[in-house]
Amino acid sequence: MTELKYSWFPGCSAGSTGIAYTQSAKYVADKIGLEMKEIDDWCCCGTSAARITDDDLMHALPARSLALSERQYPGLDVVAPCTGCYSALKGAQHWARQSEENRKHVSELIDMDYAAKADVKSLLEIMVEPDVVDLTVSRLQKTLGGMKIACYYGCTQVRPAEVCNFDDVENPTSMERLLDACGAECVEWGFKTECCGASNHVVKPKAARKAVERIFRNAKACGAEAIVTSCPLCWLNLDMREQQINSEMGTDYHLPVYYFTELLAMAMGATPDEAGLGYHFEPAAQLAQDRIVADTKTEEVTR
């Protein structure tokens, strides 16, 4: 098994709206021996705002942090937990690798040499490696207890295919494999990669709420009792809007929205607060506590 050591790009949401993701990810990382070295002086990746503003800005912002990582942690690949950050960093890396002209141009923009040799990976991409899945299962104190889960990847976890080269763009299954191995029951549904409308909530709030409602409606119709994601923007948009949608549309959705790392942390022995469940808008602790329980099989595996 390769050494689990990576350069860590936390992203802007890590200490704010995505703090539950950061907290649970670090808990899991500690349990499985995943070492993540934070890039010193990293900057905002620019995400979609830079993408619609200027091509040079879109490439320069993530390339700067990637170049710093190459200087500080030579030979280490970069892990970006936020899928928005992952998309931006992966896109800049892909563009720089297309030609020496591109690489030199972005190096001039950031006034640093960017070699574009280290790979960029999402946290999910690391966690679903077969050896890491086996290691994760070996660290469980409890199972996910057959919790019926709708795995939600969002727009950028697997797209575009030529850049990400990770899982199927229409029907990804990597998160399901990980959570199934930990005792969950992942449902089949068709909204795994549908947009939640997060970027439209300011300019087109009705359209965005409609997108969120469709996701909850379809997850519930497919028998899910929770939605699990790897994207801080999706998590915030879904979790924050659920009660609002119930009030405005007369629906009755009460599906907790979890990060996949929160469930893994709970199964590894974390309390709800340690796993980050106290940061949710829709109450999430009770379902997790009810479903995530020790059983004979888990006790034998972890003994």
PLM feature segments, named:
Residues 1-303:
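Iron-sulfur cluster-binding electron-transfer modules in prokaryotic oxidoreductases
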